Amino acid sequence: MSPKSAFTYRDYEALPNDRRRYEIHDGELCVTPAPSIEHQIILSNLVRALMRHIPSVAPGLLLFAPLDVILSDRPDETTIVQPDCLYIAPDRMALTSRRGIEGGPTLAIEILSPSTRTIDRVTKRGLYARYGVPYLWLIDPDTRAIEAFRLEGDRYVVAATAARADPVDLPPFTGLALVPDALWPTPPRDR
């Protein structure tokens, strides 16, 4: 995409507030629908579990979408993402600003959905690696599993996987004892 047609942060700020999720990947606008109720329940359960752990063992800042993570604000390669959840360790607190997070958080967490599966697994994973996000979790409601990745050089390697009811530590946290089965929603009522 040429710089003239690339989306910039200024273009991004002018987008409507219409319940869609807008991101810019290397100057290209990416639009996805609002998350499903299942997605939101998983996110809520995850945030609750992490909030029990973070203040006492891993000081830092836990935030969740919608929140702009501005990986690059250059006119020719603007990249703005909205991970479902993110963690900022104390050594990265300077990244916080009125606009959002300006740089790579310590941990980005994406909950896969039918409309974002390829974007999260391929596009955003590549962007997070390029911009130096040390850790990435991909949560898959279909397989009821969590993959935790650690950045080595310019690529992610699997650091841990989690499924079922076994408590597990996932990097960058120690002593977390996250129980994956506690994240999944109970089946919704039919109406």
Feature names for model-found ranges:
Residues 1-191:
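Gly/Pro/Ser/Thr-rich low-complexity, intrinsically disordered segments predominantly at protein N-termini
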